[in-house]
């Protein structure tokens, strides 16, 4: 499968899952984006069109993180989970954004679950 087909497949899955799982204030959407070297995660309220929280491996507090990409992803998941629990959010809808539930995406989800998020 070539690069163009992979991108088209991911876009198709992304739009299908976005239509299915809408985030609200009580149960926001945990949206993951993964680039080759970084990982980004946001809590999105689709009803009001607002970003409630966001954490990435590029943010100032995470600039000096050492370890493998999976270890960093697990740390990012724990951080978003802890911040969400502090705001009173415990239930979320997990949006893997068309990426396979494997590797860094799975590590981020495991870290968020360890911090207390339910999905």
UniProtKB/Swiss-Prot annotation:
Keyword Cytoplasm (UniProt): no
One Pfam family of this chain: Ribosomal_L18p
Disordered as annotated region, ranges: 1-22
Residue pairs linked by disulfide bridges in the UniProt entry: none
GO terms, molecular function: 5S rRNA binding; structural constituent of ribosome
UniProt keyword annotations, A-Z: Ribonucleoprotein, Ribosomal protein, RNA-binding, rRNA-binding
Gene Ontology BP term (one): translation
Protein's job: This is one of the proteins that bind and probably mediate the attachment of the 5S RNA into the large ribosomal subunit, where it forms part of the central protuberance.
Annotated NCBIfam families: L18_bact
Annotated family: Belongs to the universal ribosomal protein uL18 family.
Protein name stated in the entry: Large ribosomal subunit protein uL18
Native source species: Chlorobium phaeobacteroides (strain BS1)
Species lineage: Bacteria, Pseudomonadati, Chlorobiota, Chlorobiia, Chlorobiales
Gene (UniProt): rplR
């Amino acid at each position: 499968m070539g690069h163009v087909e992979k991108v088209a497949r991911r876009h198709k899955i992304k739009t299908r899952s976005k239509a299915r799982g809408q985030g609200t204030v009580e149960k926001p959407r945990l949206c993951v984006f993964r680039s080759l070297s970084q990982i980004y995660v946001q809590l999105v309220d689709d009803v009001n069109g607002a970003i409630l929280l966001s954490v990435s491996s590029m943010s100032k507090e995470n600039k000096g993180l050492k370890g493998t990409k999976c270890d960093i992803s697990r740390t990012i998941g724990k951080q978003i989970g802890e911040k969400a629990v502090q705001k009173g959010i415990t239930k979320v809808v997990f949006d893997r954004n068309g990426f396979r539930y494997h590797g860094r995406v799975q590590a981020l989800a495991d870290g968020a679950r360890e911090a207390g998020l339910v999905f």
